[in-house]
Amino acid sequence: MTDKPHQCVIIGIAGASASGKSLIASTLYRELCYQVGDEHIGIISEGSYYKDQSGMTMTERVKTNYDHPSAMDHSLLFQYIQMLKAGLPIEMPVYSYVEHTRRPETLHLRPKKVIILEEILLLTDLRLRQEMNLSIFVDTPLDICLMRRMKRDVNERGRSMDSVIGEYQRTVRPMFLQFIEPSKQYADIIVPRGGKNRIAIDILKAKISQFFE
């Protein structure tokens, strides 16, 4: 954890795909909004910063390894974090997991006291780590992550079960072992058992609440 001015506090939450990190992030966001007001806290998904692939065919898009750091536009995310810290609003990209590229619209986000970042590859990027006041890794067994991912991608993203399993074998698991799991060493706090670990959520909420004092 680095000592940063508290004008804009950055909380990073990483972990395997379907580990429960998004649930933890959304729970913290919802409960802290109730506590301090939504004008003081925001949330950003690294998944919004997949690179724009509008110039590629759908066949080319589906071949992208979305679990590799090169699929992410971390430079844009880093730039936007710096803008928020400078008191400037940003226009967040909106990514379509069905079309595998960015949508034309953006989401307006004003600077907040606390910004929660969440997604799989956040801790693999040194620039992003250096901007974080608190870094968290959600540590969930891979077999549980796979079951959750299958349910999510089939029901919410229009994927077939065969394609989800194939992608898991080709890229998700290998990239987790190569990039995501090693990034756990950079976390200030490791949360076991995913998004339903209520004790961990309460501890994190108490820690983040200190930044509002």
Curated annotation (Swiss-Prot):
This enzyme's EC code(s): 2.7.1.48
Q: Which GO terms describe its cellular component?
A: cytoplasm
Q: Which domain of life is it from?
A: Bacteria
Which GO BP annotation is one of this protein's? CTP salvage
Q: Which SUPFAM superfamilies match?
A: P-loop containing nucleoside triphosphate hydrolases
Reactions mediated catalytically: uridine + ATP = UMP + ADP + H(+); cytidine + ATP = CMP + ADP + H(+)
Q: GO molecular-function annotation terms?
A: ATP binding; cytidine kinase activity; uridine kinase activity
Q: Name one Pfam family in it.
A: PRK
So where does ATP get bound?
G15, A16, S17, A18, S19, G20, K21, S22
- Alphabetized UniProt keyword annotations: ATP-binding, Cytoplasm, Kinase, Nucleotide-binding, Transferase
User: PANTHER family from the xrefs?
Assistant: URIDINE KINASE
The identity of this protein, by name, is Uridine kinase
